[in-house]
Amino acid sequence: MAKAKFERIKPHVNVGTIGHVDHGKTTLTAAISHVLAKTYGGEAKDFSQIDNAPEERERGITINTSHIEYDTPSRHYAHVDCPGHADYVKNMITGAAQMDGAILVVASTDGPMPQTREHILLSRQVGVPYIIVFMNKCDMVDDEELLELVEMEVRELLSEYDFPGDDLPVIQGSALKALEGQPEWEAKIIELANALDSYIPEPQRDIDKPFLLPIEDVFSISGRGTVVTGRVERGIVKVGDEVEIVGVRTTTKTTCTGVEMFRKLLDEGRAGENCGVLLRGTKRDDVERGQVLAKPGSINPHTTFESEVYVLSKEEGGRHTPFFKGYRPQFYFRTTDVTGTIELPEGVEMVMPGDNIKMVVTLICPIAMDEGLRFAIREGGRTVGAGVVAKIIA
């Protein structure tokens, strides 16, 4: 079957459902798909299609995720839904499904539950920028005051994790009733879609961000100088641009004197392209794999950071035994491994395969990093964990 052509006319936004088990995340996903298809056109996916999530592998980690798409008049959305709690943890930490915003589903019959809190914390740690709340199962609660109480509780919980709990949209609805086609509840799904459109800003495209290229290889071309190669992660580099070489050693400045792709000379290299960048006056030994080429001042080297980490289970090819404080694995950032030590949270003695944990990492040499950068934890070339930089310390 031929693939449908992807029409990029409208802005594209990535969202997903998060929240406690059985609060109705998948039912809501199906309801959004149905109501928006019915209202604005498009293909509706039913509950069983979404619930039967295919298994994916991201950096060797098994994750079950459902991807659906839907449209509002002004935007195209890609929406992820996961069947199990562990899938959410892995998904958010590996960045397998980056979210520009999340829909937090809370059953009004239960109020916030342990995984509600954990998903909010994870969203904070991995940098999900916006959360919208959908209070589900409101058809089962007759008491208006009870609904207000649950809403207050959810807002307070979000504020506790530095989300704007008082200001973010909370929609009270019933995913099941909307799916059954009851107009008053379908209207709530449209209200949710409007909130997605108005509350989540249009994400900045990679090409509009400051230039960054992780260096994979360094060559010396006689008579021309030093060329670094890699895939441009974000932004654009033009011939004549001043750039910085960041990470591992002291940051140095140089100028891009040429860009080439497949042996052809170009004026610029753009996000997503594999290219070689010729650097003025830079010696072959001044640059190495693991450094990045970046727009001056846009990124700094750091060694110590707080991270959220998922430790692979034995079945995923991870460790068979726990690790303890003083553990010294390799941390793989972009193109290179760096040794580092870990500090576990107070009261945590050991970490078991399959756990997710907050830890402070100190690397033996600095790496160019921003909050939100993903990394792998490796032992002898084998991946044993995945993590994300939550907060830079030094």
Curated annotation (Swiss-Prot):
All residue ranges annotated as the tr-type G domain in the record: 10-204
Chief site of localization: cytoplasm
Region G2: list its residue ranges: 60-64
> What reaction(s) does this enzyme catalyze?
GTP + H2O = GDP + phosphate + H(+)
The UniProt annotation puts the region (G5) at 174-176
* Residues reported in the UniProt entry to bind Mg(2+): T26
Provide the residue span(s) of the region labelled G1: 19-26
Q: Which residues bind GTP?
A: 19-26, 81-85, 136-139
Q: Where is this region: G3?
A: 81-84
**Any idea where this protein resides?**
Cytoplasm
Into which EC class is this enzyme placed? hydrolase
Q: Which domain of life is it from?
A: Bacteria
Q: Where is this region: G4?
A: 136-139
Cellular component, GO annotation:
cytosol
Q: Which Pfam families match?
A: GTP_EFTU, GTP_EFTU_D2, GTP_EFTU_D3
What EC number(s) is this enzyme filed under? 3.6.5.3
Q: Which NCBIfam families match?
A: EF-Tu, PRK00049.1, PRK12735.1, PRK12736.1, small_GTP
HAMAP family named in the record: EF_Tu_B
Task: Cite the record's note on assembly.
Answer: Monomer.
Purpose of the protein = GTP hydrolase that promotes the GTP-dependent binding of aminoacyl-tRNA to the A-site of ribosomes during protein biosynthesis.
What is the similarity comment for this entry?
Answer: Belongs to the TRAFAC class translation factor GTPase superfamily. Classic translation factor GTPase family. EF-Tu/EF-1A subfamily.
Name used for this protein in its record: Elongation factor Tu 2
| The organism of origin for this protein | Shewanella baltica (strain OS155 / ATCC BAA-1091)
Query: Lineage of the native species?
Result: Bacteria, Pseudomonadati, Pseudomonadota, Gammaproteobacteria, Alteromonadales
